[in-house]
């Protein structure tokens, strides 16, 4: 297929599907942008968050070969970005349509950099598939817990990893507020590729950083082994079932599946219901996720 036809086809789908949020010029200023948090990506500067390339580098993209692990932008469009308004477009747009949209974005909307400029745009690729994770042993988790303090991760993510550290008023590169990730809710991790309990996704983020945000790359000040320890510890914090197995994730919502039937399993007679959530009686009960929202007045 001619590259011009590919870009033209991608432009049609972009304006139909994406322009409402991203804007006609790809500057993240579409009519609905103010209603989204985080805001849509600003394409013009070529700053993309989720990559297998080093901090500050362009992501991997091949307009013709959507190879897993070698085509960051295609995977983002295919799987979406959990924890944001960016949905999965798999099943909505065909593979060819997704590649066409990305051809339009990378050639027409990224204005300050060129994906085709191989001299100026070097890429140091993290070959994640070739790396073998370190087992999440008790020793590894202990080292990871020590490293998140040593590397000052807790300043943003908090001592308990709930995204409530002392780094208030964090901003992204465009001046918009941004919140540190809550490590207990791994299904909201950007770039989890609908596989939130996969420790490799966490390792990738620590290795590459998140462009456009305060989250740096730790590739230069940690060893590969240290990053596996950190990733193991962060992964261990994500909520699980009482028996330690991962929660079942709904592929449509990227959130834990909701069981609407809550069976009674505790009869106290005349005793009082314990108010402390850490009480052993509550720890024996199966976990339930109940989504709540504010009331919208007329």
Where are the regions that the model predicts?
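His/Cys-centered metal/cofactor-coordination and adjacent catalytic loops
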Residues: 1-6, 20-46, 55-56, 61, ...
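Short, non-ligating residues that shape and space the ligands of small metal-coordination modules
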Residues: 27-28, 95, 162-163, 224
């Amino acid at each position: 297929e001619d590259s011009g036809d590919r870009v033209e086809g991608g432009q049609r789908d972009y304006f139909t599907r994406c322009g409402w949020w991203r804007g006609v010029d790809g500057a993240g200023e579409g009519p609905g942008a103010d209603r989204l948090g985080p805001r849509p990506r600003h394409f013009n500067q070529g700053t993309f968050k989720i990559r297998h390339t080093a901090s500050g580098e362009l992501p991997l993209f091949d307009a013709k070969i959507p190879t897993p692990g070698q085509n960051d932008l295609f995977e983002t469009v295919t799987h979406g970005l959990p924890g944001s308004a960016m949905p999965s477009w798999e099943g909505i747009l065909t593979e060819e349509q997704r590649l066409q949209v990305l051809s339009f974005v990378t050639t027409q909307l990224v204005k300050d950099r060129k994906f085709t400029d191989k001299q100026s745009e070097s890429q140091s690729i993290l070959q994640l598939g070739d790396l073998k994770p370190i087992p999440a042993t008790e020793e590894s988790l202990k080292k990871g817990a020590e490293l998140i303090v040593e590397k000052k991760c807790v300043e943003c993510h908090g001592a308990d990893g709930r995204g409530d550290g002392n780094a208030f008023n964090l901003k992204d590169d465009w001046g918009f507020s941004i919140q540190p990730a809550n490590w207990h809710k791994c299904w909201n991790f950007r770039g989890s590729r609908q596989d939130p309990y996969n420790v490799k996704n966490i390792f990738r983020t620590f290795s590459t950083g998140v462009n456009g945000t305060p989250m740096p790359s730790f590739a230069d000040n940690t060893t590969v082994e240290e990053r596996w320890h950190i990733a193991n510890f962060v992964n261990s914090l994500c909520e699980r079932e009482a028996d330690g197995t991962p929660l079942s994730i709904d592929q449509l919502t990227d959130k834990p599946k909701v069981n609407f039937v809550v069976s009674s399993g505790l009869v106290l007679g005349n005793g009082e219901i314990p108010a402390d959530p850490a009480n052993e009686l509550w720890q024996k009960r199966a976990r339930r996720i109940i989504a709540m929202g504010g009331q919208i007045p007329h």
